[in-house]
Amino acid sequence: MVLILNIETATKNCSVVLAKDGETISIREIATQNFSHAEKLHVFIEELFAETNLKLQDLSAIAVSQGPGSYTGLRIGVSAAKGLCYALSVPLIAVDTLELLARKITIDNGIIVPMIDARRMEVFCAFFDANYNKIRETKAEIIDENSYQEISET
């Protein structure tokens, strides 16, 4: 049995998922306009394990969003994940937030451009091909209706 605790705190959403052999068995999440990661993250983790009657010691690994995203949110999620991994002697799996968003979409050809609010009128974005290979590195940029004109013309 492979049991992975998944932590996402890169955006205003705070979510924790417990997956067993690749299938979600329990989830807790909140999406608000205010960041509540510090208050909710550890409570959510405790609730998942109470609901499933599993123990932290049953974990095979912990996966955490590595960003890009909210600096404070990422620090909260990564710190919690690293602390648990150290205490439990399990591997830490860092996952690219934009790649996760890209993998929610299936295309035969073309480019996937996931974006996350970077504040100050900017977005974090990267380009992925249909096989989810990153073809342009992550950047924070201000976009407008003409920002990706050269891509849409190809």
Where are these regions (language model features)?
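Buried hydrophobic packing segments
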Residues: 45, 80-84, 102
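Short glycine-rich anion-binding loops that position phosphate/pyrophosphate groups of nucleotides
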Residues: 12, 67-68, 118-121
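N-terminal beta-alpha supersecondary unit
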Residues: 1-66
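DPxDG-like acidic metal-binding loop motif
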Residues: 61-92
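Residues at secondary-structure transition points
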Residues: 32-40, 71, 75, 79, ...
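Ser/Thr-centric signal marking residues that sit
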Residues: 9-11, 72, 97, 154
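Surface "functional belts" at beta-alpha junctions
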Residues: 23, 91-154
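Phosphate-handling active-site elements
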Residues: 50-57, 86-97, 107
